[in-house]
């Protein structure tokens, strides 16, 4: 039997050098680590890792080749009260594995035990890691490096974006390959998108609870192997990495960046009753935030929380991020529940992971976007992230919906959100682009559902409609559900136009949810994380070409307005913005606080957004000059106007002089 050489303690993971494979694994509390390799017949061969440098266990297997399947058995104490849950009867995934063979099914053998260890061996059914070798021709690929001030983000799901697209070949729909297909790239270019933000593509598992209900985790926020691509999105699991990189290369050639939604806050091992896949059995005490009683701090709502203040976990997370940038050429990250990244356990801007990213010559150069909260006390941290980060701006989302759909927002608050929420983000030398403005996202109602439903309808999720937020700030315009009279359809259309205009012509970085530009509906489900079906797949055959054209025209218009593209904070008297009332006069203090919902926003001294968010048709006196409506508002109903615009109820128009 081949003997393991001591090998090297770096880098983490399994790495082929042309002669064999070096294996390394971190565990500060293990007493012994076995490397388990499996031959073509599934026969297991075990080797003790002979090297032990600090907290890194390592060994070198001569003559091992790419394609080798492996896992680990980690020996140590079973002391739940102290946070130790070692169980060598369970085969464990390498946290740095780049490919996984097998499925993460709901099976009792994939659990370690709660109070007492489960000593039944699970190697026969446990997923295995696969050694891979990386050879890829990037040709002349270069990151677009779109300036933040010019960035337009499009949030999409790999499968849902193309699975029903009639112009994409059937055999690649819903895959990484489809992202790089000319039809999809041309669509994104014509729409005006500069960055495609993908929901998680790192390998994830469906929660046992969902599997028992016949559902699956669709969004992917349940990671199990952070260095491995989710194989279900590949035409062939063996070529997933190349398929993904082919798509990125094609998108880059078109000038479109790729941003990955990444989950560094928890793992698919869930709570103490959850499955044992990897980290819990390798070094539970180090990888997770552990309470005094040995249970997990559940600051994520998912059962566990990664301890990103531990030096080894910081190294792991940093290596993961560098891998996606260096190996896959991604252009940035959106961090799910990103407040966890700054926990020490209190949130700090100089937390270890933030510092590591700041000091990294690779990671400090890519786009970084935070979902700036978690569910722990002090978890709402909007505006408090380090300067390198942009942040999801939920202030903008709620203000836009309240202004146009609930009619209960003062003009002053609306204007503040329109101006990149400077009260929140204008600090620590940050720019307006730090505010990622959104009206909708994957989590919540789609834009169409915002104007068709007053209440969530999540019954299909199997939780008796208890899941999902009740704070939607939506308005069904008098009838719950899709369809209705022509008048109802038109009023809903006008509200959609108003919300899109507010999003795409405001200061900050706009993020558009895929499908909103052609009227996609989830039939009132505002938490469709477990709906891998026609509820979430974009139906291109039913897309509204008129709404798509309207959205594209708005994005094109945005790119013509210097005040929105220069990424500088607006200052009084700088010519970037003037706020006027219906008579083209500066608003008084009382009008800002209590005035009617009528407003004129003059941008760069020649683009005018006239707003009438009241229930009545209202005359709006335009500033001096000859004004004409511009696309997407130009038409027979909007000729050249020199003095007054008849503003329809809940309407707006954009003019140029």
Swiss-Prot record:
Q: Which UniProt keywords apply?
A: Carbohydrate metabolism, Glycogen metabolism, Glycosidase, Hydrolase
- Residues crossing the lipid bilayer are none
What name goes with this protein?
A: Glycogen debranching enzyme
Gene Ontology biological process terms, A to Z: glycogen catabolic process
Fetch the PANTHER family from UniProt: GLYCOGEN DEBRANCHING ENZYME
Region (Disordered) spans which residues? 460-479
Q: What is its EC number?
A: 3.2.1.196
Recorded GO molecular functions are: glycogen debranching enzyme activity; hydrolase activity, hydrolyzing O-glycosyl compounds
| HAMAP family per UniProt | GlgX
State the family named in the UniProt similarity comment for this chain.
Answer: Belongs to the glycosyl hydrolase 13 family.
State the pathway, as annotated in the record. Glycan degradation; glycogen degradation
Give the enzyme class: hydrolase
Database matches in Pfam families: Alpha-amylase (PF00128), CBM_48 (PF02922), GlgX_C (PF18390)
Question: For this protein, what reaction is catalysed?
Answer: Hydrolysis of (1->6)-alpha-D-glucosidic linkages to branches with degrees of polymerization of three or four glucose residues in limit dextrin
Q: What does this protein do?
A: Removes maltotriose and maltotetraose chains that are attached by 1,6-alpha-linkage to the limit dextrin main chain, generating a debranched limit dextrin.
**What positions does UniProt annotate as the active site of this protein?**
336, 371
Query: Site annotation (Transition state stabilizer): which residues?
Result: 443
């Amino acid at each position: 039997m081949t003997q393991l050489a001591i090998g090297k303690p770096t880098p983490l993971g399994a790495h082929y050098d042309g002669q064999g494979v070096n294996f390394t694994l971190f565990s500060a509390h293990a007493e012994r680590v076995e490397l388990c390799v499996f031959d073509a017949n599934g026969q297991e061969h075990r080797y003790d890792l002979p090297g032990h440098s600090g907290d890194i266990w390592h060994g070198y297997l001569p003559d091992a080749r790419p394609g080798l399947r492996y896992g680990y058995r980690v020996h140590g104490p079973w002391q739940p009260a102290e946070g130790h849950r070692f169980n060598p009867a369970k085969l464990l995934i390498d946290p740095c594995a780049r490919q996984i063979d097998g499925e993460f099914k709901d099976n009792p053998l994939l659990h370690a035990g709660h109070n007492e260890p489960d000593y039944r061996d699970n190697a026969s059914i446990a997923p295995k890691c696969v050694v891979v070798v990386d050879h890829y021709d990037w040709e002349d690929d270069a990151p677009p490096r779109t300036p933040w001030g010019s960035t337009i983000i499009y949030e999409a799901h790999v499968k849902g974006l193309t699975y029903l697209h009639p112009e994409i070949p059937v055999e690649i729909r819903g895959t990484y390959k489809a992202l790089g297909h000319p039809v999809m790239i041309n669509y994104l270019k014509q729409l005006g998108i500069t960055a495609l933000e993908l929901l998680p593509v790192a390998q994830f598992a469906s929660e046992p609870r969902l599997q028992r209900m016949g559902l699956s985790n669709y969004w992917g926020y349940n990671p199990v192997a952070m260095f491995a691509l989710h194989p279900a999105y590949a035409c062939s699991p063996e070529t997933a990495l190349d398929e993904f990189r082919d798509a990125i290369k094609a998108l880059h050639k078109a000038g479109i960046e790729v941003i990955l939604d990444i989950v560094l806050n928890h793992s698919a091992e869930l709570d103490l009753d959850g499955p044992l896949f990897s980290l819990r059995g390798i070094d539970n005490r180090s990888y997770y935030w552990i309470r005094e009683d040995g249970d997990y701090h559940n600051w994520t709502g998912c059962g566990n929380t990664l301890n990103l203040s531990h030096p080894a976990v910081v190294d792991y997370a940093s290596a993961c991020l560098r891998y996606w940038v260096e190996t896959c050429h991604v252009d940035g990250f959106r961090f799910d529940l990103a407040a966890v990244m700054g926990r020490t356990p209190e949130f700090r801007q100089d937390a270890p992971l933030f510092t590591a990213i700041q000091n990294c010559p690779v990671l400090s150069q890519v786009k970084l976007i935070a979902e700036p909260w978690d569910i722990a006390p002090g978890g709402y941290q909007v505006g408090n992230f380090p300067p390198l980060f942009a942040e999801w701006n939920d202030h903008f989302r709620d203000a836009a919906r309240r202004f146009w759909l609930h009619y209960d927002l003062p003009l002053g608050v609306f204007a503040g959100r329109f101006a990149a929420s400077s009260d929140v983000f204008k600090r620590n030398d940050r720019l307006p682009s730090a505010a990622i403005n959104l009206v909708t996202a994957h989590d919540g109602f789609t834009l169409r559902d915002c104007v068709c439903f007053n209440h969530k309808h999540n019954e299909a999720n199997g939780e008796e409609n208890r899941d999902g937020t009740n704070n939607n700030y939506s308005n069904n315009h008098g009838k719950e559900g899709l369809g209705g009279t022509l008048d109802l359809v038109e009023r809903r259309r006008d509200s959609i136009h108003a919300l899109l205009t507010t999003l795409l012509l405001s200061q900050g970085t706009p993020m558009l949810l895929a499908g909103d530009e052609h009227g996609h509906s989830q039939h009132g489900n505002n938490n469709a994380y477990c709906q891998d079906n026609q509820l979430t797949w974009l139906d291109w055959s039913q897309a509204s070409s008129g709404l798509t054209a309207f959205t594209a025209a708005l994005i094109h218009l945005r790119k013509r307005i210097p005040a929105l593209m220069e990424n500088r904070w607006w200052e009084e008297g700088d010519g970037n913005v003037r706020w006027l009332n219906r008579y083209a006069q500066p608003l008084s203090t009382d009008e800002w606080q209590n005035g009617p919902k009528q407003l004129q926003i003059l941008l760069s001294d020649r683009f005018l957004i006239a707003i009438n968010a009241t229930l009545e048709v209202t005359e709006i006196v335009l500033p001096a000059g000859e004004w004409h409506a511009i696309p997407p508002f130009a038409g027979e109903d909007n000729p050249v106007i020199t003095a007054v615009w008849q503003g329809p109820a809940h309407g707006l128009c954009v003019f140029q002089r």
